[in-house]
Amino acid sequence: VNDWAISRSRYWGTPLNIWTCSCGHKESIGSISELVEKSIEPIDESIELHRPYVDDIHINCPKCNEQMTRVKDVIDCWFDSGSMPFAQHHYPFENKENFDELFPADFICEGIDQTRGWFYSLIAISTFVMGKSPYKNVLVNDLILDKDGKKMSKSRGNTVDPFEMFDKYGADVLRWYLLYVSPAWTPTKFDVDALKEVQSKFFGTIKNVYNFFSLYANTDNIDP
């Protein structure tokens, strides 16, 4: 695991739980109860912890007794995502049985682009906190490329408008094509002409079978 600068100079996000003093001392608050205990302002555990509300909470500096103020930064959203196994259960403060039953996960599934994102942040945080991986298996779905195997890009002019495909061929044709054209873990070379084949050979066959059945079913008054 490499060094990770988890702070972000943004407004929205999980506030970085660090208070600083003009004397240079820093304090990291580890829980709501600790913040309630140390807060100069009268607050309780129902306090809203997001900005701007948390920025109005100050604590006394244990070094010089001056007022400490929270830094304005928030935490990298990937840290939030990587904390999912613990955060969703508010572990270790509660739901320990639920956590123990579900951790580690049997598998996680995401796109190949999450290798340095969610896959990494999950395993980095879990290994640090729990000493083991948060998942047993990783299922990866690869990227959708153009028919020549090149990345789709507006500058190349090889992008495909899904809504145009829906209108022309139908959503079910597009769904079925993406399911069968290649394994989910390999790149998909998207070929618009192949949609026509799916529409005629697969859905067209189903439609013809139904039409054949309904023709004679109606003639013989069959009620399936």
Residue spans for each PLM region:
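Structured secondary-structure scaffolds
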Residues: 1-219
